From Swiss-Prot:
Topology class, membrane: Multi-pass membrane protein
Gene field: psaL
Main location: membrane
Record key words, sorted: Membrane, Photosynthesis, Photosystem I, Thylakoid, Transmembrane, Transmembrane helix
Protein name (Swiss-Prot/TrEMBL): Photosystem I reaction center subunit XI
Membrane-spanning intervals of the chain: 71-91, 124-144
Length: 152
């Protein structure tokens, strides 16, 4: 009984283990915005950016060097927007060097084709910037509004 099989071509090095070849793992990975079918590149970037902007706000606001200042929330917002801008620049640079079409693997048998072009990466980066700044603004708004709601 051999539990670990090669995932198609043994020379590729993608082993089919009980973890990555399970139906749960495949369904989980294929429902992430990067691999979900039917999304445009800009929509993928928007969803990924919203998640990153939202969860990057907390460390900047609560653990940053200005955490004890009165304007820690604004400093966290500006730090998050700055990092999202740098990440957008990195995505744009990656897309401009000429990417190849995504390869199909064991966990993602149908990778999105629109991330195999410069235009697709440009749209992804634009959506990431908008989504990241929006996610940071939502997190900032929640941190500002929640203490006011506790007084009610």
């Amino acid at each position: 009984m051999d539990i670990i099989q090669h995932g198609g071509d043994p020379q590729v090095g993608n082993l089919a283990t009980p973890i990555n070849a399970s139906a749960f793992s495949k369904a989980f990975i294929n429902n992430l915005p990067g691999y979900r079918q039917g999304l445009s590149a800009q929509r993928r970037g928007l969803e990924v950016g919203m998640a990153h902007g939202y969860f990057l706000y907390g460390p900047f606001a609560l653990l940053g060097p200005l955490r004890n200042a009165d304007f820690a929330g604004v400093a966290g917002l500006l730090g998050t927007v700055g990092l999202i801008s740098l990440l957008t620049l990195a995505l744009s640079l990656y897309g401009s060097v000429g990417v190849s079409t995504p390869t199909a693997t064991l966990t993602t048998p149908n990778p999105p084709e629109n991330l195999g072009t410069k235009e697709g990466w440009s749209e992804f980066a634009a959506g990431f910037l908008i989504g990241g700044c929006g996610g940071a603004l939502v997190a900032y708004g929640l941190c500002i509004a929640l203490p006011m709601m506790y007084t009610i």
